[in-house]
């Protein structure tokens, strides 16, 4: 629905501990974190292990598997989430970042099951140094 707006342009940051970038919810209403079915990331053509990535929303940060259990934590449409890639140290310059986000829309049944949608966005961004 909003695939070209999933990755926030110019949000790629990095330091010696890893990298991060921001994403937006590809839907028009807030959804619980438990509706995330998949979040996959590739940087410069190399897939990052989804079991290692972390997602930060509101004032919390979780591994993807933990976030998928968070029924009471809501991702609001106007709030960016930060995707952290621990250990992925990037050199200065431009990098190709791709994210695929699959969400389950619990209140829209299709053939007796909640609607499931997957959107992919790709951006070329210059890495910025992560500041405290």
From Swiss-Prot:
Catalysed reactions, semicolon-separated: 3'-dehydrocarminate + H(+) = kermesate + 1,5-anhydro-D-erythro-hex-1-en-3-ulose
Disulphide bond pairs: none
Highest taxon listed in the record's lineage: Bacteria
Keyword GTP-binding assigned: no
Record key words, sorted: Carbohydrate metabolism, Lyase, Magnesium
Activity regulation summary: Activity is strongly reduced in the presence of chelating agents.
One Pfam family named in its UniProt record: CGDB
Cofactor needs: Mg(2+)
InterPro entries (UniProt xref): CGDB (IPR045959)
pH-related activity note: Optimum pH is 7.5.
Temperature dependence (free text): Optimum temperature is around 40 degrees Celsius.
Known function: Carbon-carbon bond-cleaving enzyme which participates in a carminate degradation pathway. Cleaves the C-C bond in 3'-dehydrocarminate to form kermesate. Also shows weak activity with other C-glycosides, such as 3''-dehydropuerarin (3''-oxo-puerarin), 3''-dehydroisoorientin (3''-oxo-homoorientin) and 3'-dehydromangiferin (3'-oxo-mangiferin).
Quaternary structure annotation from Swiss-Prot or TrEMBL: Heterodimer composed of an alpha subunit (CarB) and a beta subunit (CarC).
Family listed: Belongs to the C-glycoside deglycosidase beta subunit family.
Record-given protein name: 3'-dehydrocarminate deglycosidase beta subunit
Species the sequence originates in: Microbacterium sp
